Curated annotation (Swiss-Prot):
GO terms for biological process: proteolysis; symbiont-mediated suppression of host innate immune response. Coiled coil: none annotated. The record marks G248, N249 as: Cleavage. Pfam families: Peptidase_C7 (PF01830). This is Polyprotein p69. Residues 1-248 form the Peptidase C7 domain. Hypoviruses induce hypovirulence in their fungal host Cryphonectria parasitica. The consequence is attenuation of the related fungal disease, chestnut blight, that causes cankers that enlarge and kill branches and trunks. The virus-like genetic elements consist of cytoplasmically replicating double-stranded RNA.
């Protein structure tokens, strides 16, 4: 798209000077490359000595220009009198930007587009439609073919083009090219008849600081079918009052329809009628709204759809299952969840296990995403084993399944703290630094807890403690006066209910995801004094699964009777758990398949008969 021409005279030196001394490449540059494109009307009229500014439609039709001069009025520079930097809006249309900056550019429109522009101008200037466009919901037939398929949102035009808000969006580009900024009233009345919109919102015509220049403010909130007719009436009244009036000072930057594209907002257009749907859709209907992350984004054109898709892809490579779950299912704080539905979860877990056992290895060991869970990765031993290895995404599938079945299919609303971003990694601290950080945090924690307890006691709360040792002392003191099942278990639960409550509260406020679960806190806690250490040791002895019972959480969370019931439903035999040396969190599972087969649940038996038959192997005695 570039034509070659002879180099301009300024570049070639006269023969008298020796060319080699001046420029060794003179002969190389025999042809000079110039970008094609017409001279703009702005430049042409400037060179003729006229005052450059958009012409009326009649003048533009009568104007004779030499070849190579385009007739687009969009290239005219906006006069300084009307420019208002503070309230002005930044256009996007390259020609408008160039004109606004006062830099003339070449016009690179195709010939065909120019011809169509001219036909449009002819049509609008010479005749009137049978029924005006602002009465019916779309431009009348003769103009319809001249409306581009490309929607011009108002964000693309800057100051001087506010009159476009009452014009059908598919005709805006053509109108802007044939009319330029600040349309004359007479021309505007014709434009409204040919390509005016029927409903665009309530409007207001204001005088600007420059005389004979008016500004249209449109409020898109309340749209009605009569907007177009009322507006036409108002403009014709204005024409009668002030025949020299021109409309189009600036777009109001606060108007709902205008927002620079960087803000990724979309103009709420009332859609035009298409052939498919015979009549205009409801006037108040908003555009399609698509969710991008947790933000809804309005979509009115293909361009917006592309933008939305791009934004989606930035946020999540794949469609984000967790976002779906967040929308569809109730979600519980994890510990509570397991405490409530342990038996059912484990049954489902076993069912999953048996399904997986029948699948080939490649399916059984799926490659996983970053493993960050609601229960910290470090605390995964608190989850049932099957779930301990799953990613949060896969786990949420299992949870959501039970959230529905257990709550009579009603998913209630609940708050979700989004998880830490798995893609962000930081350098691990050195051991010394880590220890230092931990001790520092612990010191702060203890001060915090003590302060909390102190405040609470001052308020008159009785069951608040500042440390484990104090918790155990108060518990033992209380148990002296009333029946207690087992002092230390109760002590542990006191620790849970009091100390942890404040911490969890803090973590929730800080927007963190993990709550400290009971037992993990007991195991991780570093004693602050000898007495504390002794107390802590005895608590740990009671809780140690190797010595006492199979399921730790149940023991701490409920009384012993509940625990026995839980133990029976889980059918975990009270033997010490054998730890696997390689992975400290992987417990060898006791009586894995026998567990469900011999349970007292009849329905279970019915379900399992086939599976049992499949797994029984009889010894063949030779």
């Amino acid at each position: 798209m570039s034509c070659l021409r002879k180099p301009s005279q300024s570049l070639v030196l006269s023969e008298s000077v020796d060319p080699t001394t001046v420029d060794p490449f003179v002969d190389v540059r025999a042809e000079e490359v110039v970008p094609t494109g017409c001279m703009t009307l702005w430049e042409y009229r400037d060179s003729c000595g006229d005052v450059p500014g958009p012409l009326s439609h009649g003048d533009l039709r009568r104007l004779r220009t030499p070849d190579g001069v385009c007739k687009c009025q969009i290239h005219f520079e906006f006069p300084t009198v009307l420019k208002s930097g503070s309230t002005g809006t930044v256009p996007e249309h390259p020609a408008v930007v160039a004109a606004f900056m006062g830099r003339p550019r070449r016009c690179s429109l195709e010939q065909r587009t120019k011809e169509l522009d001219f036909r449009f101008l002819q049509l609008v200037h010479e005749g009137l439609p049978v029924r005006p466009s602002y009465m019916i919901a779309r431009p009348p037939r003769p103009v319809r073919g001249l409306c581009s398929s490309r929607d011009g949102s108002l964000a693309q035009f800057g100051q001087g083009y506010c009159y476009l808000s009452a014009i059908v969006d598919s005709a805006r580009w053509r109108v802007a090219r044939t009319t330029g900024w600040c349309v004359r009233v007479a021309d505007y009345l014709r434009l409204l008849q040919w390509v005016g919109r029927r409903s665009f919102g309530s409007f207001q015509i204001e005088e600007s600081t420059v005389e004979h220049v008016y500004h249209v403010i449109v409020d898109t909130e309340h749209q009605s079918e009569q907007d177009g007719a009322l507006f036409y009436q108002a403009v014709s009244d204005l024409a009668a009052r002030d025949p020299l009036a021109r409309i189009g000072n600036q777009l109001n930057p606060l108007a709902a329809e205008f927002c620079p594209r960087s803000a990724r907002r979309v103009e709420p257009v009332t859609p035009q009628v298409t052939r498919r749907k015979g009549l205009a859709r409801m006037p108040g209907r908003s555009p399609t709204v698509v969710s991008v992350g947790n933000v809804g984004m309005a979509i009115t054109s293909i361009q917006d759809a592309l933008v939305a898709t791009e934004l989606r892809n930035v946020n999540f490579g794949r469609r984000d299952t967790e976002a779906e779950c967040r929308r569809l299912w109730a979600r519980y704080e994890v510990n509570d969840y397991f405490r409530r539905h342990k038996a059912e979860l484990l049954k489902f877990d076993a069912r999953l296990r048996s399904h997986m056992a029948k699948k080939p290895v490649s399916v059984r060991t799926r490659s996983s995403d970053a493993k960050i869970q609601c229960i910290g990765w470090r605390d995964r031993h608190l989850l049932p084993q099957r779930l301990a290895g799953l990613t949060k995404q896969k786990r949420s599938l299992i949870w959501s399944r039970f959230a529905t079945s257990n709550i009579r299919r009603k998913a209630s609303a609940c708050t979700m703290t989004p998880s830490v971003d798995p893609m962000v990694h930081t350098w691990g601290d050195s051991a010394a630094l880590a220890a230092k950080k931990i001790s520092e945090a612990r010191r702060r924690q203890e001060i915090c807890a003590a302060a909390y307890a102190e405040r609470a006691k001052a308020r008159g709360q009785t069951n608040v403690v500042a440390s484990i040792s104090e918790a155990i002392e108060t518990t033992l003191r209380r148990n002296g006066t009333r029946f207690a099942l087992d002092g230390l278990h109760v002590a542990a639960s006191v620790i849970v209910t009091t100390r942890l409550r404040s911490w969890n509260q803090e973590e929730v406020l800080a927007g963190r995801e993990f709550r400290k679960s009971t037992t993990s806190w007991i195991w991780r806690h570093m004693p602050s004094s000898i007495q504390d250490a002794l107390n802590l040791t005895s608590v740990r002895d009671k809780l140690d699964p190797g010595r006492a019972f199979g399921y730790v959480q149940a023991a701490v969370a409920q009384g012993m009777s509940d625990f026995r019931r839980a133990k029976r439903s889980l059918a975990i035999v009270a033997k010490p758990v054998i730890r696997n040396v390689r992975d400290p969190y992987d417990h060898g599972f006791v009586k894995r398949d026998g567990k469900l087969r011999h349970s007292r649940d009849v329905s279970n038996k019915k379900l399992r008969t086939k599976a049992v038959a499949a797994t029984k192997v009889h010894k063949i005695i030779f």
